[in-house]
Amino acid sequence: MDYEIENNHADSIRRGSIEVICGSMFSGKTEELLRRLRRAKIARQTVEIFKPTIDIRYDETDVVSHDKNAIASAPVDNSANILLLSSQVDVVGIDEAQFFDEGLVEVAQQLADQGVRVVIAGLDMDFRRQPFGPMPGLCAIADSVTKVHAVCVECGRLASYSFRRVQGDQQVMLGELNEYSPLCRTCYRKCSSPPQTEEIHSTI
């Protein structure tokens, strides 16, 4: 009986891909990114990790999750630098992708076309529930999109939205639970509605 021996190395050609992990704040996006990158390192693949220089909430260089799990990364000012620093790697990880410029979409495409596995995590919506930065374009070109959810702090259901609890109209405002809360659709609408004031009718 003849047996066909599987070639674990598959082709000699590397197969690139783009994986996007998206969701609201406190949904575990960075945790999932770190999990995938650690598995790649265990498999002895070369990994480079990038984050925007603006993200200094926990550490100036490391990618750090809300649970304080961390992995060393290279902070970069713009997406073009990712291409320059990603030569001869198997996997590229990118955290807080929403803070990058729109050029990140083309950067991810080029890396994947070169045979690199690109794993990206970021907020898909801002606090107004509007598409955030390059995330819509990244989701469009991705080979796989994983939408993760937080838990609504008001009712306990799955949360998809990041509700800002402090004043400010600017789209980018770094913060934690004191500034943002994950909410479901119903609770987001309730918290976004102006408080109802009881109308008082005076009688003469």
UniProtKB/Swiss-Prot annotation:
Protein's UniProt name: Thymidine kinase
Sequence positions that bind Zn(2+): 152, 155, 184, 187
Location(s) in or outside the cell: Cytoplasm
Origin species: Porphyromonas gingivalis (strain ATCC 33277 / DSM 20709 / CIP 103683 / JCM 12257 / NCTC 11834 / 2561)
Binding of ATP, residues: 23-30, 95-98
GO biological process: one example: DNA biosynthetic process
Gene Ontology annotations for the cellular component aspect, listed alphabetically: cytosol
Transcription in keyword set: no
InterPro entries found in the cross-reference section: P-loop_NTPase (IPR027417), Thymidine_kinase (IPR001267)
Molecular function, one GO term: zinc ion binding
